[in-house]
Amino acid sequence: MIQSFTRLNVADNTGAKEIMCIKVLGGSKRRYATVGDVIVASVKKALPTGKIKKGQVVKAVVVRTHKEVQRENGSLIRFDDNAAVILDAKREPVGTRIFGPVAREVRYSGFMKIVSLAPEVL
């Protein structure tokens, strides 16, 4: 469950290491984001040689949350961290590699490129 001011790790090779959620997209009063949701975020930590710089405002899709997500079959899935993948204007990933596992809910949200780049889909 991601809300404003939540800090997330970046699970791709764009050069950004940590982002902070500014807004959850999808409705004027929407408060929380979960796996597969798109957020607007500010880059808080970044590598100096990366594509994304510190202070830049980006869109990202949440791929892992520490708060468990209930699936339709009743099972729960939870990760050790909150993580996101940075997107461009066409909602395609900016990076060329994804690090760590990705939840299956990302596939249902229509981010097939992220699912194909991920080393593991849980």
From Swiss-Prot:
One Pfam family hit: Ribosomal_L14
Organism superkingdom: Bacteria
GO biological process: translation
Cellular component terms (Gene Ontology): cytosolic large ribosomal subunit
UniProt entry tagged with the keyword Metal-binding: no
InterPro entries: Ribosomal_uL14, Ribosomal_uL14_bac-type, Ribosomal_uL14_CS, Ribosomal_uL14_sf
Keyword Cell cycle: no
Keywords: Ribonucleoprotein, Ribosomal protein, RNA-binding, rRNA-binding
One example GO MF annotation: structural constituent of ribosome
HAMAP family reported for this sequence: Ribosomal_uL14
Family the UniProt entry places it in: Belongs to the universal ribosomal protein uL14 family.
Assembly with partners or alone: Part of the 50S ribosomal subunit. Forms a cluster with proteins L3 and L19. In the 70S ribosome, L14 and L19 interact and together make contacts with the 16S rRNA in bridges B5 and B8.
NCBIfam families in the cross-refs: rplN_bact
Purpose: Binds to 23S rRNA. Forms part of two intersubunit bridges in the 70S ribosome.
Protein name as annotated: Large ribosomal subunit protein uL14
Species this chain originates from: Aliarcobacter butzleri (strain RM4018) (Arcobacter butzleri)
Gene from which this protein is expressed: rplN
